[in-house]
Amino acid sequence: ELGLQGVQVGSHVGDWNLDAPELFEFFQAASELGAAILVHPWDMMGTPSMPKYWLPWLVGMPAEQSRAACCLIFGGVLERLPKLKVCLAHGGGSFPYTIGRIEHGFNMRPDLVATDNPRNPRDYLAQLYFDSWVADDRALRYLLDTCGTDRVMLGTDYPFPLGEQEPGAGIASLALSADDQAR
């Protein structure tokens, strides 16, 4: 009705992780409407135990994004809604960089990890989108190589202080092909 193409949600909603049954109708409606969902970290876990060095923003935010991705995957949200368009801000946080560990845990302890979804978590990399703001050219290259150039889009984190000061500089620094940049 409003012509909006998508919405932004936090990495969790209050005390609910993104696999909470109370949130499924929201994700289902977004999927049916073809609306995109940007997941941005907030209210970082462990904040009380990290009072110094801006640690909630430096290490808590990446962990929040991994938490969100794992809940969407392990909770079966992405399995039940294969057309759901989800983009994880900050390059997916630590999720793409720990997918090997996550997959290993899935394979070694399915009794704990695969309780609500028996599908390998790595399979969902092709279903998720990631923004490009990772603050490191090598990390961006890894993200592109791991998730695919068609799954990574420009991200700046504007207007927050950790955002990319020159939008697109990270992508431009990689000397990607014109086709990859266009994606």
Residue ranges and their predicted role:
Residues 84, 94, 129-130, 134-153, ...:
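Mid-to-C-terminal alpha-helical segments outside catalytic/metal-binding sites
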Residues 1-76:
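Active-site gating/metal-coordination segments in enzymes
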Residues 14-15, 43-49, 81, 93-97, ...:
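Active-site environment of divalent metal-dependent phosphoester hydrolases
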Residues 1, 26, 69-73, 80, ...:
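Alpha-helical packing segments of well-folded alpha/beta enzyme cores
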Residues 76, 82-123:
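Aromatic-lined glycan-binding groove of carbohydrate-active enzymes
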Residues 2-7, 33-35, 82-85, 121-128, ...:
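Short, well-ordered coil/turn segments that N-cap beta-strands
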Residues 6-13, 39-41, 88-90, 132-134, ...:
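A cross-domain feature marking catalytic cores of carbohydrate-active enzymes
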Residues 1, 19-23, 99-103, 139-144:
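Distinct, well-ordered alpha-helical segments
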